[in-house]
Structure formats: C-alpha cells, structure tokens
C-alpha cells in the first residue's frame, strides 16, 4: 500500500472520529441545558454555567463551542455533506434526550450556522486553515447563539454569555488546530520528497 493510500485511509479514520464526536456534541449540549449547571432558571429556563467572571450562559455552550471546531474538522477530512448528516443524526439523538423546543431550536441553529460555515470556512481552509477555523467559528457562534436563544427561550438575554463561552472553546482548540496543520504540512512535504 502506498504512503498516499495510507494517509487517505488515516484521514478517513480521523474524520470518522471527528464525525462521531460532532454528532454527540449536539445531543450532549441539549441534555446539559436542562440538567447541568450551577443553577437552573425557574419555569423551564436553562441551567447556567459561568463563562467569565460575572457572566453566565446556558450550560450546553461549551459543548457547542467544541462542536463548531469539530464540524470544520469533519469538513476537512470527510467533506461538507458529512457535517450536514451529523446534524441530522445529532437532532434525532437529541429528540431522545431533550425537550422538543430545544431540539428544534438547536437543529435550526446548527443548520443555519453550518451554511454560514460553508460560506466562510470552505473557501479559506486550503490556504489558511487556522484562519478558516477562527473566522468560521466566529461567524458560526454568533449565528448559532442568536437563532438558538431566540427560538429556545424567546429572547437574547444570554447572548453575550453564549458568545463568550463558545469563543473560549474555539480558543482552547487552537493549539490542536495548529498541531494538525503542522502535521498535515509535514506529511505533504514527505510525499513530495518521496516522489522526487
């Protein structure tokens, strides 16, 4: 088996891992909103977690921040249509764990932010991978937060906390994104050297 075939197979396996993690982030975030937090807002409001001093957000925020990065990795390894399939599977799993209003709100928010991600990440990823992840996540987290909060709770009261919490997860992921870019560059260089 050639080195190129091995790398392609490894990329698909790596992509499958990202895909499974991404699919699981969606129901995990929805479940957390109703069950995990330092306190829960009465009368069906979300459970909240601190994301900065004096700033709270619905508890699924950190998981969604991770999902924003994972979907870029799914697209990089498997293609953008796999990320849409992951949203569908994640929504179906969410229906088993969360209130219908959360499932509808999160599915709509993930889909719209995915379309925004396509517009930003897809054209940038080959030339500027780290910039693509940062830019698409920034756009996606704002779109996702606004639509989700409006559909799930009828207000944007938690918008700043949502944005900050998701941004933290993007920032935390950047060393891994940098490592991934460097590893991919080293592999590409070794293929060129082996062919030359």
State where each predicted segment sits.
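Cytoplasmic-side transmembrane-helix entry/capping segments in multi-pass membrane proteins
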Residues: 14-19, 78-89, 128-135
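Alpha-helical membrane segments and adjacent membrane-interface helices in multi-pass membrane proteins
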Residues: 31-39, 43-111
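Short, intrinsically disordered terminal tails adjacent to the first/last structured region
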Residues: 1-6, 190-196
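C-terminal ends of transmembrane helices
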Residues: 3-6, 67-77, 118-125, 177
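Helix-boundary and loop/linker segments of multi-pass membrane transporters
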Residues: 11-12, 79, 96, 125-126, ...
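The first (N-terminal) embedded transmembrane alpha-helix
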Residues: 16-33
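N-terminal membrane topogenic signal
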Residues: 3-21
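Membrane-embedded alpha-helical hairpins and interfacial helices in multi-pass inner-membrane proteins
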Residues: 103-195
């Amino acid at each position: 088996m050639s080195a190129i075939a091995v790398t392609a197979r490894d990329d698909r396996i790596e992509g499958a891992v990202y895909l499974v993690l991404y699919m699981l982030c969606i129901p995990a975030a929805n479940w957390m909103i109703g069950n995990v937090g330092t306190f829960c807002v009465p009368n069906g409001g979300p459970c909240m977690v601190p994301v900065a001093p004096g700033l709270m957000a619905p508890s699924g925020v950190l998981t969604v921040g991770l999902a924003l990065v994972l979907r870029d990795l799914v697209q990089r390894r498997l293609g953008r249509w796999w990320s849409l399939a992951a949203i569908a599977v994640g929504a179906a799993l969410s229906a088993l764990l969360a209130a219908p209003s959360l499932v509808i709100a999160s599915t709509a928010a993930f889909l719209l932010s995915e379309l925004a991600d396509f517009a930003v990440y897809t054209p940038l990823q080959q030339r500027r991978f780290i910039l693509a992840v940062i830019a698409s996540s920034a756009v996606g987290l704002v779109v996702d937060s606004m639509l989700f909060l409006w559909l799930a709770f009828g207000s944007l009261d938690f918008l700043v906390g949502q944005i900050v919490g998701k941004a933290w997860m993007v920032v935390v992921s950047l060393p891994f994104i940098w490592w991934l870019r460097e590893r991919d560059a080293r592999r590409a260089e070794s293929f060129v050297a082996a062919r030359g």
